[in-house]
Amino acid sequence: MEDYGLPLVPEAIRRISDSADRKLAWQFFLMFSRFEYALKRQKYVRADRKDAQAAWKSFANDHAVKFSANHDPQLQRAIAYIKQAPPKKQIHENRVLDWAEPKHFSGGPLLPWLLDQVQIIRNNLFHGGKFPQFAVSDPSRDRELIESALVVLGHALRLNHDIEHRFLEGIDL
């Protein structure tokens, strides 16, 4: 990891940024952030907020019927993994960090539940939720969740041509 002239980048941060999973995390970051950009550009913006936040639930509800894993084994595996081992959500009570029990799929449209899980995976990764007091006991679980989330995002993107177009705009292919 380059230090870009920054004072004293801690060794722990250097180890994380130089890990084998760096590329996977970077791909997830790019995919998630471009998807949010595309949602907002296509007017999927939460009306209940002044700050521009992507309306993931609206998108998921609008496209839930079209979403299907029937003919894609990779998507089937990703969904099965997230259903089997959904991410925990970091919570706090009286300023003490803890983990909520995962929200398991209980029926109904699958896409809204899956995109909720993808957002939890993103929050855990990018807000440091996986390291509140100690390192994660099974990093491979995080890797599988991130890989599964990437597969779900890729398939969700193809549900709406306009969103897919916005996702790709300005990116030299």
PLM segments and residue spans:
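Short helix/strand-bridging catalytic loops that position acidic/His residues to coordinate divalent metals
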Residues: 14-20, 134-143
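Charged/polar positions within long, soluble alpha-helices
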Residues: 37-40, 44, 123-131, 154-165
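Histidine-centered, metal-coordinating catalytic motifs and their short helical/loop contexts
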Residues: 111-134
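Amphipathic alpha-helical interface elements
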Residues: 1-117, 166-173
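Amphipathic, Lys/Arg-enriched alpha-helical patches that create a basic surface
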Residues: 141-171
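Hydrophobic packing residues in well-ordered alpha-helices of helical domains and bundles
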Residues: 28, 115-118, 139-142, 146
